Amino acid sequence: MKREQKAQIIEELAGKLRENSVVLVDYQGMDVAQSTELRRRSREAGVDFVVAKNTLTLRAAEEAGLPSLTEFLVGPTALAFSRDPVAAAKLMAEYADEIETFRLKGGLLEGSRVLNEQEVEALSKLPGRDQLIAQVVGGMAAPISGLVSVLNNTIQGLVVALGQIAEQKQAQQA
């Protein structure tokens, strides 16, 4: 590989490392069908699955000013990038459960915190970004809808009471 190509790859990887969370995996022993399936699932989940030389990945991390990933860059290593830290962890952990030779190595959370294998596994069990947003919005909407229900029931009760008073007045006049 020429120097220009290496420099371009390092620059691309550094950009991805700065802008995304990343999960590092050992993909040794995967066949072509398994690799193709993983890439398809990655695209569907919005995860960018990249295989790069360890030396280039190490240089990219240094160029991006990130913590050292040296401990994870031993043997065949692939990187799964995602803006949603949980998405990449969840997908890679699911695949590691399905394929014996595929295993999690570690990760980098939002470009600053190095995660070991157990921490990536724990991250994969959390709800995704969209689910968390939905839970927060639902939590905020619940008290409001409860208030609307109480006010609605109060108004209905008032209308019923006024209707009964009107009937009593009409009965007294008759």
Curated annotation (Swiss-Prot):
Please give a single GO biological process term from the UniProt record: translation
GO molecular function: any one?
large ribosomal subunit rRNA binding
Q: Which domain of life is it from?
A: Bacteria
Enumerate the Pfam families for this protein: Ribosomal_L10 (PF00466)
UniProt xrefs under InterPro entries: Ribosomal_uL10, Ribosomal_uL10-like_sf, Ribosomal_uL10_bac, Ribosomal_uL10_bac_type
Query: What keyword terms does UniProt attach to this protein?
Result: Ribonucleoprotein, Ribosomal protein, RNA-binding, rRNA-binding
Q: Which GO terms describe its cellular component?
A: ribonucleoprotein complex; ribosome
Q: How does it assemble?
A: Part of the ribosomal stalk of the 50S ribosomal subunit. The N-terminus interacts with L11 and the large rRNA to form the base of the stalk. The C-terminus forms an elongated spine to which L12 dimers bind in a sequential fashion forming a multimeric L10(L12)X complex.
- What NCBIfam families does this protein map onto? PRK00099.1-1
Q: Which family does it belong to?
A: Belongs to the universal ribosomal protein uL10 family.
Function of this protein? Forms part of the ribosomal stalk, playing a central role in the interaction of the ribosome with GTP-bound translation factors.
Q: What protein name applies here?
A: Large ribosomal subunit protein uL10
Please spell out the taxonomic lineage of the organism that makes this protein.
Answer: Bacteria, Bacillati, Actinomycetota, Rubrobacteria, Rubrobacterales
- Its gene is rplJ
